[in-house]
Amino acid sequence: MEKAEAAAVVIPLSVSNPSYRGSGMSDQEVSEEQSAGDAWVSAAMAAAEAVAAAATSTGIDNTNDYTYTAASENGD
């Protein structure tokens, strides 16, 4: 049985790291791309803060403090 060869995957530097785009992009295009990336990060952080605020307002505490006391559970 012949051994199958895996296809080579080439990721251009312009995809994996936009700072390597070279002279093909104008400063305006680079600036717009960076602004779009910054806007995406800001939106994601705002959404995370909104979720955290909603969880706090509904009484969900996410401090990872899972102290268990049997007496308090049993009303003793």
Curated annotation (Swiss-Prot):
Keywords: Host cell membrane, Host endoplasmic reticulum, Host Golgi apparatus, Host membrane, Membrane, Viral envelope protein, Virion. It is found in: Virion membrane; Host Golgi apparatus membrane; Host smooth endoplasmic reticulum membrane; Host cell membrane. GO terms for cellular component: host cell Golgi membrane; host cell plasma membrane; host cell smooth endoplasmic reticulum membrane; membrane; viral envelope; virion membrane. Signal peptide: none annotated. It is a single-pass type II membrane protein. Its main location: virion. Belongs to the alphaherpesvirinae envelope protein US9 family. Essential for the anterograde spread of the infection throughout the host nervous system. Together with the gE/gI heterodimer, US9 is involved in the sorting and transport of viral structural components toward axon tips. This is Envelope protein US9 homolog.
